[in-house]
Each structure stands twice: as structure tokens, then as C-alpha cells.
């Protein structure tokens, strides 16, 4: 399937995948309901899809993959569903701790980790420590956990205000680059392509600052059914776009 990505455009130039792809992993519950299964079965299937798509992204040359795993609004779901999602994350992190170095996969977290269980926070910290010792050029998966775009911006504003109060920064110092350094995504390029499966046509509070010039790809495919061929179609659609960044094509 990688041949679909490593294709050529009308000028005959090879088309590489975007450097940074972000995905809103949506549709797990509906996937399960269509099959008469509990919603937790959909989340389990979605977790397997994440593993497969992350591996494929790494293999075709994507450097960063950011996924929306659990939003600040997802706490409104049933206690059983939240517990199941956190259990899947724990299992994934336990596996990742043992394989990250061998597979050359860096793992980073976006979001406010304060409400997360101490055990899960400790695992996330351990993966961060392992990632810090891996080469920066290695593939990196960013997992958005208890994340919301507005919350991220508010936390960044508070950190900047605290630095101003401490005399370390001045309000007039603030520009795009400085503000970006206070975000969860600091040091990571903005996503060129944001993908949302499941047929929904909204961002749902995902990467609100970082998506300023992202291209969007929406598909009716539910996340557990999202496969390498669908990702290839998303990347092909991305390459068909005329990205002008507010300018005029010469």
C-alpha cells in the first residue's frame, strides 16, 4: 500500500507523506453498536487500529502522528466506559515501555494529566523518559489524554502570565513562536493533515491553535475500520490540495 503514497503528481515529482498527521479517533461506540457489542468492544478494536496505523505511518516516513485518545469532555461518559478506555491505555503503555527502544518509537502526551490515575501518570512519565533518550529523528506518536484545545490554550496563557509575574517574561515579548512554546505541542511542527473518520464534520476541540493551516480529510469510515488504504486516500487527497497559506499562487 505504500506505493499509493509514494506516487507522483502531475509534474512527475514523488509525493512523500505529510511530516505530521493528526487523527480524531472517532466512531468506536457506533462500530460496536452496529455489531450488537458493548461500546468497550469498540474501544478495544479502535486501540488495535491505532497500533496498526501508527506502524504504517512509521513505515511510510511520517515523523509525527498525533491522536485524540481522550478529551476533557469524555469524563461525561459512563464510569464503566471511562474505566475501559483507561485500562486500554494502561495496557498499551505497559507494552510500549518494553518495545519503544527496539522499535525506535518515541511517545509523548498532550493534555492535563492531573486528573489521571497516579499509575497511568507514572507510566506516561516513564515513556517520556525513554523517549528523551531516543534520537529526535525517530517516529513519534503524540497521545492526547484528557486533552482539549481550549484547555491547552488556557494552560499556556496561565504559564505565560506566571512567567510575566515572576519577571521572566514581558507581555510585549509575546508572539506566535513564544506562545507556541507554552503549548503541549512545543517543539513539534503543526500537523499538515488532520483526519476525522466516522462521518462527523467538526474538530471537537482538537488542536485549535495548531490547525491554522492544516488540511482536513473527513471520511464516513468508522475508526475501527480505518485501514492503510484509507490513510493512503487521505494522503492522496492532501497532495491534491493547493496550499497557499493565505497567499496567492504565482
Task: Label every PLM stretch briefly.
Residues 1-250:
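Flexible, compositionally biased loop and terminal segments
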Amino acid at each position: 500500500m505504500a506505493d499509493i503514497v509514494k506516487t507522483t503528481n502531475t509534474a512527475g515529482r514523488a509525493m512523500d507523506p505529510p511530516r505530521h498527521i493528526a487523527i480524531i479517533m472517532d466512531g468506536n461506540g457506533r462500530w460496536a453498536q452496529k455489531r450488537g457489542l458493548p461500546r468497550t468492544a469498540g474501544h478495544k478494536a479502535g486501540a488495535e487500529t491505532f497500533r496498526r496505523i501508527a506502524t504504517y505511518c512509521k513505515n511510510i516516513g511520517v515523523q509525527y502522528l498525533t491522536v485524540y485518545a481522550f478529551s476533557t469532555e469524555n469524563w461525561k461518559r459512563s464510569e464503566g466506559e471511562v474505566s475501559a478506555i483507561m485500562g486500554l491505555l494502561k495496557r498499551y503503555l505497559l507494552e510500549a515501555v518494553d518495545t519503544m527502544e527496539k522499535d525506535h518509537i518515541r511517545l509523548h502526551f498532550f493534555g492535563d494529566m492531573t486528573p489521571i490515575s497516579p499509575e497511568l501518570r507514572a507510566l506516561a512519565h516513564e515513556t517520556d523518559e525513554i523517549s528523551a533518550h531516543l534520537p529526535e529523528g525517530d517516529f513519534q506518536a503524540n497521545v492526547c489524554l484528557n486533552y482539549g484545545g481550549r484547555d491547552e490554550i488556557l494552560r499556556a496563557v496561565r504559564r505565560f502570565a506566571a512567567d510575566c509575574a515572576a519577571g521572566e517574561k514581558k507581555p510585549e515579548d509575546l508572539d506566535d513562536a513564544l506562545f507556541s512554546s507554552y503549548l503541549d505541542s512545543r517543539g513539534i511542527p503543526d500537523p499538515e493533515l488532520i483526519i476525522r473518520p466516522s462521518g462527523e464534520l467538526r474538530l471537537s476541540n482538537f488542536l485549535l491553535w495548531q490547525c491554522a493551516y492544516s488540511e482536513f480529510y473527513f471520511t464516513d469510515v468508522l475508526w475501527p475500520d480505518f485501514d492503510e488504504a484509507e490513510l493512503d486516500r487521505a494522503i492522496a487527497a492532501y497532495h491534491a490540495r493547493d496550499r497557499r497559506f493565505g497567499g496567492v499562487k504565482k
